[in-house]
Amino acid sequence: MADPDAPRRRTLRFETIDDALAEAERLVAADREGRLARAGNWSLGKTLGHLATWTEFALNGYPREVHAPLPVRVILRMMRGRILNKGMVPGVKVGRLPGGTVGLDEVPPEVGLARWRTALHRLKASAPTIDNPAFGRLTHEEWVKLNLRHAELHLGNQVPT
């Protein structure tokens, strides 16, 4: 049975990169002040490092192990509009990767935030020129939306108290 006193995941909606960064900065401040609880398993530092890693992949290239097999790509491309506009579902794993994803290093929240901020500023300035390994070619707006939906998913597990 679930703990009724455990923090509940928050539903977030970011319209801009600046909105997402403002929320991350608020969470880092709450964490520093000892006012941050988790609805999920990841610390804030791990969460921000993970978000930074995936934003950096879009800009610098994806490792082979995160490329989806063809049948999965076909399904995900059919779901692209729904994911980009409505959000991501918690609990999805990337293939057979340990931990279900990559970018899971534990880092101080300030370090994760600095990396993510740098990557998001690059993304804001120009669109990635590579294909996304799951969704294929994306417009600049779609790349931004994808990163915002990813941030909503993970930052929703960080609960200021």
Predicted segments, located by residue:
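Short, contiguous alpha-helical
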Residues: R32-L84, A125, T129-T161
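Amphipathic alpha-helix face/heptad-repeat signature
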Residues: R13-T16, A20, G112, W143, ...
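Short, exposed beta-strand "edge-strand" segments with a Pro/Gly-rich flavor and a Y/T-containing core
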Residues: A6-E15, A37-N41, G103-E106, D131-L138
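Amphipathic, well-ordered alpha-helical segments in soluble domains
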Residues: A20-E23, H50, W54, R115, ...
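Short, helix-capping/interhelical loops that line the mouth of catalytic, cofactor-
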Residues: A2-R9, N60-R115, L120-L123
